[in-house]
Amino acid sequence: VIKVAIIIGSTRPGRNGEAVARWVHDLALKRDDAEFELVDLKDFDLPHLDEVMPAAMGRYSHPHTRAWAAKIASFDAYVFVTPEYNHSTSGALKNAIDFLYAEWNNKAAGFVSYGSNGGTRAVEHLRLVMGELQVADVRAQVALSLFTDFENFSVLNPSAEQEDAATAMLDQVVAWGQALCPLRT
């Protein structure tokens, strides 16, 4: 059974990301084809990237980087829950991704985004980043609109169609995560 991280990609006070990630996690827990774990960037307290050596070298000098690397390396696939800020992902998520390299390689990723336009532009940016990290990103995604999937822009209330989209995305993430296992052995 593969392990999938559901990564909360915002550290902002009052963030919607935690509720979105918990919704995805609750859906995922109904499955028996993978283990799912919530991973909150706030729990790692990563500063702005402060490693002297490039991540591709894998020589991490700080305890916070080593802890983050160990956590990320323990998974076979990822679901990134991201807000859209100014047509991109959050700075906190991009920073956390940039701390590491090999820990991401040859794994699968799916995306759940939210924002005034569903957060799709944040996902497009993340897809480019994933390619550089040798991560296979799946086609199915969830794009939650602050106008239709939230009440008062802050209380998550997704439609049944969004649940179907999440199921499709999880199906693909698990399938690709399993398929890529031989590349990681």
Regions found by a protein language model. Name each.
Residues 105-147, 160-165:
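Short, glycine-/small-residue-rich phosphate/pyrophosphate-handling segment
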